Amino acid sequence: MIGFLQGKVLNLEADNVLLLVNQVGYEILLPATVVASVQNKLSDEFLNLYIYYHQTDRQPKPVLIGFDSAEEKDFFQLFITVDAIGPLKAAKAMEHSVSTIARAIENKDVAFLATLKGIGRRTAQKIVAALHGKAGRFLLAADEAGAGDGVSKTGTPSLPIQKAIDQVVDVLVQQLGHTPSAAKMMVAQALDRDPEIMTPEALFDEVYKGDVDA
């Protein structure tokens, strides 16, 4: 199974890249946001891509889909859990940043989701129904995805707990519409349930786990 490739760009098209890795050329399908990112890296010696490998009985020819970061790939894998959204459809639909799509899901913005390529209103409603409460952690991780030299860490490093608290409260207030007092209460309750939390992603997941359980 192929999970990551580093190589030299031989050719870049509107929705795919031909990547030379150890004298083998890999044709890799790219979401629109990744194409834009690759265009800015053509002068780099190597391109790094996290790979989703797709092959089924109905799709016997392997398809490789590339992402700038592990977080983008994680979001993609969450996205394709929605009924009627397969890997190829999901790749075409990811024409905005992960944080933008995740924010629309958490805000139940069906109108915006319906504008994504290949996603109509009915599918947008399915996305919200299936993923609301699950996409919030990508609001926190997406700002770091693809930063710097394009090589993302395989996991998010632990941050001092106060920084994690501040970051989660900011997302709850600024992006999801909670009042500051309500956001702080939600975070405090999450930490009561799991005092060992040290990362903003884990804290956000626990906040919404409590919200769903309630």
Curated annotation (Swiss-Prot):
An example Gene Ontology CC term for this record: Holliday junction resolvase complex
GO molecular function, one term: four-way junction helicase activity
Region (Domain III), start-end ranges: 161-214
A family per Pfam: HHH_5
SUPFAM superfamilies with a match to the protein in the record: Nucleic acid-binding proteins, RuvA domain 2-like
Location of region: Domain I: 1-68
Alphabetical keyword list: Cytoplasm, DNA damage, DNA recombination, DNA repair, DNA-binding
Protein's job: The RuvA-RuvB-RuvC complex processes Holliday junction (HJ) DNA during genetic recombination and DNA repair, while the RuvA-RuvB complex plays an important role in the rescue of blocked DNA replication forks via replication fork reversal (RFR). RuvA specifically binds to HJ cruciform DNA, conferring on it an open structure. The RuvB hexamer acts as an ATP-dependent pump, pulling dsDNA into and through the RuvAB complex. HJ branch migration allows RuvC to scan DNA until it finds its consensus sequence, where it cleaves and resolves the cruciform DNA.
UniProt similarity note: Belongs to the RuvA family.
Protein name: Holliday junction branch migration complex subunit RuvA
Lineage of the organism: Bacteria, Pseudomonadati, Thermodesulfobacteriota, Desulfobacteria, Desulfobacterales
